[in-house]
């Protein structure tokens, strides 16, 4: 998290840049950075993050953030790609798409992430569910299905109202 009130994220970023220069790490990225935060990092250090891990799921698809990432060569990684709770998994639109493809709603959502170009790493302790989550490469969502899922996004879609513009992790 950028923790904007503390204002030390550029210093922390510089430490990561140094660690990369010293060969301690190969790639550096951030989590929950908005375009303004990213612009500041890039302007002050000249180094663009490789990845930005952001909240991304059908109820909060972050279209503008993803456009920024694409324009700057930043990989989008989705945290909470399946959202939380059963609301998204029981959504009628997603269930209909899943039924058409003979897949689970989770597989539909993970395929949606893949087709958006986002990296999703769903959490699961179940080996069977982990295998299911990887079985998303034998089908594709069509343009209309992608539009339907994108249309589920809503302004109040954040899981815990953790807005990176004001949220403080510590």
Enumerate the language-model features and the residues they cover.
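Beta/alpha (TIM)-barrel catalytic core signal, keyed to glycine-rich beta->alpha loops juxtaposed to Asp/Glu
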Residues: 3-170
């Amino acid at each position: 998290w950028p923790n904007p009130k503390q204002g030390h994220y550029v210093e922390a970023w510089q430490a990561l840049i140094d660690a990369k220069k010293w060969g301690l790490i190969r790639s550096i990225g951030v989590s929950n950075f908005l375009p303004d935060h990213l612009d500041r990092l890039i302007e002050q250090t000249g180094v663009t993050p490789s990845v930005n891990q952001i909240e991304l799921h059908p109820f909060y698809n972050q279209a503008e953030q993803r456009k920024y990432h694409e324009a700057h060569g930043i990989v989008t990684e989705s945290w909470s790609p399946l959202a939380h709770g059963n609301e998204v998994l029981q959504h009628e639109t997603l269930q209909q798409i899943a039924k058409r493809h003979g897949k689970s709603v989770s597989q539909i959502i993970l395929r949606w992430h893949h087709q958006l170009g986002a990296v999703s790493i769903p959490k699961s302790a179940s080996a069977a569910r982990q295998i299911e989550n990887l079985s998303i490469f034998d089908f594709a969502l069509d343009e209309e299905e992608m539009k339907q899922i994108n249309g589920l996004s809503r302004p109040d879609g954040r899981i815990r109202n953790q807005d990176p513009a004001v949220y403080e992790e510590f």
